[in-house]
Amino acid sequence: MVEVCVVYDKVRFEEKALYDTAKKKGLKAQIIDAKKITINNASKRKTLQFGDVVLQRCISHFRGLYLSACLEFMGFMVINKFKVGETCGNKLITSLTLAKSNVPTPKTHFAFSAESAIEVINTTGFPVVLKPIIGSWGRGVFPIRD
């Protein structure tokens, strides 16, 4: 029987639903708070009880990212893999990845100093939206209309 482990740092409806659905489908399932996990560079898969498949559901980008890296290093099958988190958690890398695959996206400028950001704004005009490379939920996003 396949064992699924849902790892979270805040239980929301989705984590409960994933756990409940796995149980209803006849899978062995567990749910673990990532904040209580400790792993070291000598940790072995056989000593950790994460089952066959780990569904990484951390809200904290960096907690989830590095937990995925550790679990993958030990050979666990992780859904929401390190590489996906690394790419999708970084707006610059996401934009470059989408452009490389010819996925249509809004024109995006990357500035590496405040001065170069101002130069881009002066060149392109208004409105503009300034965003940090890392971040979610609208934190640090500044729409500038004029």
Model features per residue range: what roles?
Residues 2-8, 72-75, 83-146:
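Active-site nucleotide/adenylate-binding loops and adjacent lid/helix of ATP-dependent enzymes
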